[in-house]
Amino acid sequence: FLPILASLAAKFGPKLFCLVTKKC
């Protein structure tokens, strides 16, 4: 797993989770 992808996932993961689950 690429470090860049890992950092992107860490950065955008919570936002995606927020949008999908509507739990912000």
From Swiss-Prot:
Keywords: Amphibian defense peptide, Antibiotic, Antimicrobial, Cytolysis, Disulfide bond, Fungicide, Hemolysis, Secreted. It is found in: Secreted. GO terms for biological process: defense response to bacterium; defense response to fungus; killing of cells of another organism. Expressed by the skin glands. One of its GO terms (cellular component) is extracellular region. The keyword Secreted applies. Disulfide bonds join 18-24. Antibacterial activity against Gram-positive bacterium S.aureus and Gram-negative bacterium E.coli. High antifungal activity against C.albicans and a strong hemolytic activity. Belongs to the frog skin active peptide (FSAP) family. Brevinin subfamily. This is Brevinin-1BYa.
